[in-house]
């Protein structure tokens, strides 16, 4: 029901990755159809989709459990350094011109024919990260592009930073303060997950920029070098662990970071487990089986592994004892209190309520204190007072 001019093309990251011989995770598509036409086609073909990004022209189709973001061509009507107000378009060149870097302004039809109005393919080949058109204009449309520039530079550049780009970023860096903390953290996550992170330790300009944007990140260079030196000992670290290596110190730096940035409850728990263990304590005295068993019980296995990895990374010479502890706790299940409320009620005739809770807490405290061992006699003594 649509004319031969209606079209859909692959766009952006998936093409950039293919041309750079990388694994493709997500496939994004662009179309000159408007969102209502896209949803009509998907309905006719019984393809599930959702419209959470429809105000920006994006509909997400789900095929064989894979998500495909289909976005209508757009042009910017208004930008304020954080958001763009867009109008839907039929013009592929205008859609390309609103993107940040040449290597992201690539399109290909379903036969693989490339539409590359800003020579992004050539920039991938020579390893050059170039803003489309005027760098200052691009940055002032959305100041997050300063942080995105660092990420793409690490992943794709084989050339040094251009002097005019350095100058433009330095002039406009203060604009990053209007970008939402969630967007900044999301971009930092992508950056720290980069397999080119080692390159960052040699890039003073990028380190200085990161330190300005995220002043809570300490010792970026030394942390990356320490990870590189001990890489053979570990599985790959996740974003949160690398972040915590840079944030946790003897001060209240972590508290300040968690106040500013919204991370999940699960990740906060990991952060506090490491921080409580290391912050202002003599770690060599506390790093023993009893203390680690307590962490295992209260925080879970991941927290123990984090604490041991943290110590290994922060220590110049790796102690073999730490490596054996790491192996031991990878295979250890958290301890379980050998008596529960039901048994207390039946064995000791304690009624349900506050007294039962208090008694369970006393038993638990004694059990933890005795390295998670307690006899029936000890339980009897606690209950009978």
Positions of PLM-derived features:
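Catalytic cores of the polymerase beta-like nucleotidyltransferase superfamily
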Residues: 1-385
